[in-house]
Every structure is written in structure tokens, then in C-alpha cells.
């Protein structure tokens, strides 16, 4: 149940957006969030800290005052480690009782449009289930039909207006960087597409052991997933002429999304 606490990721995204708008990298709420994260589930720690680091790096670049931003991240780390120590997370064995190493639970390259998860649950009325390998099921990241349609429109718009897209990416360069890092870690050194393993990148054994701390690596794509989701929503809402049209657009979007994923909702209910 603790892995369902995705509000932690959304809250970290909120502080990133707010921090960029206000030009500040330290928030007491963000410190509390990072401390809470390690108490809820350690898997969320690299996710919220990726967004915390992105905010600090971009604020440091804009203000040209890196020390306050580095101090902010250091303060967050000290608080998080203290809470983890109080909860006993740094004592005893780190083994979860499984011999599976990093790479087995990597994210398949079809994850965003593959509507199947653990126990072969069907998540779409429209899109067919595609093959997976190994533990790809643990990296479930299906966007849903409505978001895939809006996402396709967003990609097309971004390609046509590529100068605006590049300017936006440059403005949020650290966020792009941490998203790339999270995606690479989620895919892992065992790169899979549909039912095939495309290649396995050999890594030093010590690095594999370290990465195995988060062996269910596909979960680390969740911040990128929510960023894609929110980007699609913003793209749609900004192209509707009024609040009334925006409300109607959201209603249609939600209806299509719920209709598409209803098989899984009915199964799980």
C-alpha cells in the first residue's frame, strides 16, 4: 500500500514548478516532503530528490549563487537521513529475500502504450496487449487512450514549433536531465522491447549490486510519467478558448480515459 503514495511525486512536482516561478529552491514543505518520503517508502526517495536537485540546479544557474541552493539540498539530505535512521532503515540487511538483480524488473520500451500489468490485468478497451519479458510487468506505465491521443498531438505540435520546444527544454535543462537519468535507470541495462531483449549492457558487479537496491527499476519512471501526464493536460487546456471549454475538454478527456481503463477498474473492484 505504501507504494501507492504517488501524492509524494505530485507534491515534489508542485514544489519544482512553484520554485521556478518564485525563483527559490528552499521550501519548508519540500524538506518535510523529502523527510516523509523515506518514512513512507525508500523507492520514492530518488524520485523526489531528482526533482529537488533539478530545482536547485536551475535556481543556481539563474541566480548565479550556487551555495544557497547546495545548502538547501544538503539540508534536505541531512533531514532525510535523520528520519531514515530513526526508522531503522540503515540497520540490518538490505536484502529483500530475492536473488533477482537490477535489470530483471526494467521498463519495457512499450510501457507507455502497453495496457497490461501484474496478473495480466487488461487496462484498455481499444489497444491490444503487447508482449513483455521477465519482470516488465512491474514497470506498468500505461498512459491511457485519452492521454496517448493528446500526447500524440503534443508531439506533433512540438515538432512543428521546434524553436519554442527547444527554448522550453533549455529553460528546464536540469529537469530534462533528471528525467533522462530516471528513464535510463528505469529501462535498465537489460533493454527490452515487446517480447525481445534487444541487448544487455555489461556493468561492473559493484554497480549492479548498488543498483539492485532499487531493483524494481521501472518504478523510477513514475515522475517522468506524471510529467508527461501534466504536460498533456496543460497543452490541451491552453488551446481551449475559455474556462467553459476547458471544463468541457477535461470532462471529455476524463470520460474517454475512464472508458478505456474500465476493464481493469471493474476487475479490481
PLM-predicted stretches and their roles:
Residues 1, 84-93, 111, 115-124, ...:
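Membrane-interface helix-loop junctions at the exits of transmembrane helices
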Residues 64-89, 99-104, 108, 172-181, ...:
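Hydrophobic alpha-helical membrane-interfacial segments at the cytosolic entry of transmembrane helices
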Residues 28, 32-58, 78-86:
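Transmembrane helices and adjacent periplasmic/lumenal helix-loop junctions
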Residues 83-158:
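Periplasmic/ER-lumenal interhelical loops and adjacent helix-loop junctions
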Residues 16, 46-77, 154-165:
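Perimembrane helix-loop-helix junctions
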Residues 10-27, 37:
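Membrane-interface transmembrane helices that cradle and orient dolichyl/undecaprenyl
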Amino acid at each position: 500500500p505504501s507504494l501507492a503514495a504517488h501524492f509524494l511525486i505530485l507534491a515534489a512536482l508542485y514544489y519544482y514548478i512553484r520554485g521556478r516561478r518564485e525563483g527559490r529552491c528552499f521550501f519548508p514543505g519540500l524538506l518535510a516532503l523529502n523527510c516523509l518520503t523515506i518514512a513512507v517508502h525508500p523507492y520514492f526517495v530518488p524520485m523526489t530528490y531528482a526533482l529537488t536537485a533539478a530545482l536547485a540546479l536551475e535556481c543556481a544557474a539563474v541566480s548565479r549563487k550556487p551555495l544557497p541552493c547546495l545548502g538547501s539540498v544538503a539540508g534536505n539530505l541531512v533531514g532525510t537521513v535523520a528520519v531514515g535512521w530513526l526508522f531503522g532503515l540503515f540497520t540490518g540487511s538490505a536484502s529483500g529475500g530475492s536473488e533477482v538483480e537490477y535489470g530483471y524488473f526494467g521498463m519495457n520500451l512499450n510501457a507507455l502504450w502497453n495496457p497490461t500489468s501484474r496478473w495480466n490485468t487488461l487496462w484498455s478497451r481499444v489497444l491490444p496487449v503487447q508482449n513483455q519479458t521477465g519482470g516488465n510487468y512491474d514497470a506498468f506505465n500505461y498512459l491511457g487512450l485519452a492521454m496517448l491521443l493528446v500526447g500524440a498531438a503534443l508531439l506533433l505540435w512540438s515538432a512543428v514549433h521546434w524553436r519554442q520546444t527547444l527554448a522550453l527544454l533549455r529553460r528546464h535543462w536540469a529537469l530534462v536531465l533528471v528525467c533522462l537519468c530516471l528513464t535510463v535507470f528505469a529501462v535498465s541495462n537489460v533493454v527490452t522491447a515487446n517480447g525481445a531483449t534487444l541487448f544487455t549492457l555489461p556493468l561492473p558487479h559493484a554497480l549492479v549490486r548498488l543498483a539492485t537496491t532499487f531493483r524494481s527499476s521501472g518504478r523510477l519512471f513514475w515522475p517522468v510519467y506524471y510529467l508527461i501526464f501534466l504536460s498533456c493536460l496543460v497543452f490541451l487546456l491552453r488551446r481551449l478558448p475559455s474556462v467553459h471549454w476547458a471544463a468541457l475538454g477535461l470532462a471529455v478527456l476524463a470520460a474517454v480515459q475512464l472508458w478505456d481503463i474500465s476493464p481493469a477498474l471493474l476487475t479490481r473492484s
